[in-house]
Structures are given as structure tokens and as C-alpha cells.
């Protein structure tokens, strides 16, 4: 009987020892699983709105590099300029990157929106295209010209025509002149305003169109080869108001991830992809001494 009791005690001790070992392994597994969950929770997910396929391609590259920072950046592509700011303002987007400071200032003033730029992306030429003439000076009297119908891009198109010597604008018109600010039109240009996305598609029906680069590229035009006049030959003539930027809601200004997104964009890798997908048209707008907040404040004041 004593032998049986002794054996049973030994057996029970062994069972408890095995159970203890099993619990130890389970604890280690649980700990590893907990760490995996914690690591997953540490990654952040955001959505950025862009316009056009070229911008989407550039941001795809940026997003792939941000994965190493624990940031998942989803890209939502829009086909026009109105929706991305509305979506950012209502919280559907976390950031957007499609507009220059002048366009943003016009939106902020018109909608009392609390949006702000946090870093420059690129400066994109506005180009004049024609299937009728090879030199913009050769436009005939009464030539038909199509420009964007929004205030800022339409204003920039008019400034391009002024730079080309085709029209003169009222000095008091500010950074976003309108057709009513034309003070001289010696060639009697017949200027029509349409949605910016439709401008390059009007080329077959007009003597000249003045288009944003993203829409020109999407329409199969090569700004470097096909444009007969661009406004970025001398960047000093363009000004900070036409630098494009990454934009957020002001309430998110302290989000450190957003600064990481800016830093990932403002890189040599981005510049190379940008050059490839825009056929050399878009140029990096960032520098080591940027004051995007200060420059935007000035543009806001000028736009009022």
C-alpha cells in the first residue's frame, strides 16, 4: 500500500511539473501574441487625397517607403479639384496633396475652412497647347482660347497669357485675376472658361488651350515637348502662391506622423519618380529653408 501511495505521489508530481512547463510555454506564446498585437496597434493608417494618375503614382512610391515607419498611407484619387478639400474638411480624408497655395487660400476664404499646408510638394507648369500654331506669337486675330474656370487656375492662365504678351492685366487684380481684369487684348482673343479637367480635351475645338500639367498628362500631352509656352521657365515669375503643398486640418498640426509623411515625400526618391511620371514637367518645390506657413499667410492676405 505504501508503495502505491508513493508511486501515486510521484506520478502527481510529474503531472504538475508537466503542467507547469506547459503553462510556461503558453505564457511565452501569449506574450509573443500580445507583442504582435501591440506592434499592430502601433502602426498608423491615414488616407490622402490626390488628383490625377501621375500624382497617384508618386504617392504610391512614398507610401511604400512609409511602411518602414509604421505608417499605412492609403491613396484616394480624384478626377477634379472641388472634392478633395471638402473631403478633408469633413474628415473623410486625413490629408490631401493636389493644390497650390493660391487655390487653398481661395477655398479657405470662401468656406471659412481651417485647413493649412505643412510642406511643399512640387511646382507644376501651366502650359499653352495648340494644334494650330507652333509659336504662341503666331496666334491669329480673334483666336479662340480655352482656360480653366476656377478663380485661381483661371487667374494663372490669364497671367500666362500676359507673360506671353498676348494680353495685359490690371495691376490691382492681385494673384487671381479674372477675365474682367483684362485691360488690353490686342489680338481680340476669344477666351472661354471650362472646368480645368476639360481644358486639354478642348484642344481639337480651340486655337489654344491653357492647361494644368496633371490634366495635360492624363490627356496624353507631354508638357515638355507639346507645350508651346509654359509659365515656369522663370520660377521667379511664378511665385510661392503656385507651389503645391500637403494640406491637413489645423487641429492635426501636432501629429508627428504627418511630419514623417512630409519628410518621406521631400526626398530624392520622390524627385526621381516625379520626373518620370510627369515627363520632366513637375519640379520639386521644397528646400531646406521653407516657410510654408509664413508664405501661406501672405497668400491668404493677398487673396482677401
Regions of interest found by a model, annotated:
Residues 21-44:
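Short, low-complexity, disordered segments immediately C-terminal to signal peptides
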Residues 16-20:
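C-terminal motif of bacterial Sec signal peptides marking the signal peptidase cleavage site
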Residues 118-167:
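A conserved helix-loop-strand patch within extracytoplasmic ligand-binding domains
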Residues 43-46, 54-58, 68, 206-208, ...:
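An extracytoplasmic/periplasmic, membrane-proximal ligand-sensing/linker region
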Residues 106-118, 133, 205, 210, ...:
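Ligand-binding "clamshell"
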Residues 125-136, 241-255, 260:
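A bilobed periplasmic-binding-protein/Venus flytrap-type ligand-binding module shared by bacterial periplasmic
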Residues 41-53, 71-77, 144-145:
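Short, well-ordered beta-strand elements
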Residues 75-86, 174-201:
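Short helix-initiation/N-cap motifs at beta->coil->alpha
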